[in-house]
């Protein structure tokens, strides 16, 4: 694949290519058995991860890539793995993944960091479509996704993801595995979707409450909740939640309980 290296990564697309198949093989292995799954890859780049996925014989692999310069590389892969590989030239933010793959579905990707959080929030809206995600994030974002209450990283991403899934950090990686080398460390995490949400709650209402409270995370919840309801003190008292807590002190269940009272 040495000829592929002549493609210069585009900064505006957050392109950081992984060249080592040892690394991509390891990432794909974190996804477990994929032989009975449709796999979706976002930002396949030079195809290193693509080859690692196809070597494990998925039911089908569908890649979404925005950079048309990479099309010739993936045309070669399509010819080599006839019927197993589909390449879509598009922006992943514009695609509803339910329209391109048949369940069960796993997503395996080295996500473009500039849109990684936006993609995850988008997928959470129809998360029951997926079995799991094995994703490379900027380490700072990964730490937010897996964070627990009473941690400075705990926030909107933690709550909205963990309401629907178990989350695990698999491995941290330094900048040296990428070309060009980013200025940040990266982490691979597994997000394994639960059969049902942990708690029964109106998701849109929960998301609104979480967003408002964590936008002012240093304020006590009795203050920020007043932007949503006039019954803040009564609600907190009925739920035995001290009104001097900050949002990072509340569990996912407590946020759901509050949402169910509003």
From Swiss-Prot:
Which PROSITE patterns does the protein's record reference? Answer: RRNA_A_DIMETH, SAM_RNA_A_N6_MT
* Keywords in alphabetical order: Cytoplasm, Methyltransferase, RNA-binding, rRNA processing, S-adenosyl-L-methionine, Transferase
Cite a single GO MF annotation: RNA binding
Q: Which residues bind S-adenosyl-L-methionine?
A: 18, 43, 65, 91, 110
Top EC class for this record:
transferase
Q: Which InterPro entries does this one have?
A: KsgA/Erm, rRNA_Ade_diMease-like_C, rRNA_Ade_Mease_Trfase_CS, rRNA_Ade_methylase_Trfase_N, rRNA_adenine_dimethylase, SAM-dependent_MTases_sf
- List the catalysed reactions: adenosine(1518)/adenosine(1519) in 16S rRNA + 4 S-adenosyl-L-methionine = N(6)-dimethyladenosine(1518)/N(6)-dimethyladenosine(1519) in 16S rRNA + 4 S-adenosyl-L-homocysteine + 4 H(+)
Localization:
Cytoplasm
Q: Which GO terms describe its cellular component?
A: cytoplasm
Instruction: Give the record's family classification.
Output: Belongs to the class I-like SAM-binding methyltransferase superfamily. rRNA adenine N(6)-methyltransferase family. RsmA subfamily.
Instruction: Write out the function statement from the record.
Output: Specifically dimethylates two adjacent adenosines (A1518 and A1519) in the loop of a conserved hairpin near the 3'-end of 16S rRNA in the 30S particle. May play a critical role in biogenesis of 30S subunits.
Name of the protein in its database record: Ribosomal RNA small subunit methyltransferase A
């Amino acid at each position: 694949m040495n000829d592929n290296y002549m493609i210069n990564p585009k900064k505006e697309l957050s392109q950081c290519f992984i060249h080592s198949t040892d690394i991509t093989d390891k990432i794909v292995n974190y996804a477990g058995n994929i032989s009975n799954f449709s796999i979706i890859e976002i930002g396949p780049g030079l195809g290193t991860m693509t080859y690692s996925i196809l070597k494990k014989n998925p039911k089908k692999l569908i890649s979404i890539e925005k950079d048309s310069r990479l099309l010739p590389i993936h045309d070669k892969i399509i010819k080599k793995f006839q019927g197993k590989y589909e390449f879509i030239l598009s922006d992943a933010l514009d695609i509803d993944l339910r329209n391109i793959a048949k369940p069960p579905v796993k997503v395996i990707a080295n996500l473009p960091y500039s849109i990684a959080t936006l993609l995850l929030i988008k997928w959470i809206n129809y998360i029951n479509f997926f079995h799991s995600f094995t994703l490379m994030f900027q380490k700072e974002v990964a730490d937010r996704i897996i964070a627990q209450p009473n941690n400075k990283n705990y926030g909107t991403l933690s709550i909205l993801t963990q309401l629907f899934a178990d989350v695990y950090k698999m491995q941290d990686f330094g900048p040296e595995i990428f070309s060009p080398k980013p200025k940040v460390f990266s982490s691979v995490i597994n997000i394994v979707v639960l059969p049902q949400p942990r708690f029964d709650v109106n998701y849109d209402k929960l998301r609104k409450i979480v967003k408002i409270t964590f936008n002012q995370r240093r304020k006590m919840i009795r203050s920020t909740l007043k932007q949503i309801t006039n019954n803040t003190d009564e609600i907190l008292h009925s739920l035995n939640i001290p009104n001097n807590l900050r949002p990072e002190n509340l569990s996912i269940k407590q946020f759901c309980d509050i949402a169910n009272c509003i």
